[in-house]
Amino acid sequence: TRFAIQILRDQIGQRVWPAHRLDRGTSGALLFALNSATANRLGQQFEKGSVDKRYWAIVRGFPADYGSIDHPLSRQRDDYEFQGKASSSEAQEALTRFCKLAEIELPLAVDRYPSSRYALLEVEPVTGRRHQIRRHLKHISHPIIGDATYGKGRHNRFFAEQLGCQRLLLACVELAFDHPVSGERLPIKAPVSGQFAAILARFGWPDTQ
């Protein structure tokens, strides 16, 4: 997010304020404001859960066609938080919904099975805990490909070495929020690109949201 702030600031020639953040390695829609007051109003929408967020993720295995992951997550402090601020490691409620968009089984023994299964999911994090999607998908044993922290090393290496994909296969493809002045509901879409789009094409999966 910090690098995106710098790039956008240089492009438009003025300071910008982020309304939210994406995990490092996650691509997709980022929302910025041109002043701090607007950024605060947008940030409040994220905190209240009134912003609709849709992500795409490529995971190991074949999850159910639809599902909800209702699993508490312990709080994780990040580098942006004030270090002197009191915090608790107590588990917080966390809910993620998903639906399966596509799947594929490759006749290759990447792990202990004679073939390897992968799926494309559309994911909606209802709550906004740190690393929520990545941690929840690991919890149901369908980790995201390219996730060095919560994923499976053998599958990550297979995608990197055999498919030329070295990135975390998680992207924010749509945000919908209320305009902080007019109140109009605004959807913003961010198509996947680069290595993510190349994997979709290679597997014959749809690339439109």
Regions found by a protein language model. Give the residues of each.
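RNA pseudouridine synthases
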Residues: T1-L120, I140, F158-A160, L169, ...
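Phosphate/ribose-recognition catalytic cores of enzymes acting on nucleotide-derived substrates
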Residues: L137-S182
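Loop/turn elements at beta-strand to alpha-helix junctions within RNA-recognition modules
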Residues: S36, V126-T127
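Short beta-strand segments enriched for Tyr within beta-sheet-rich domains
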Residues: R129-L137
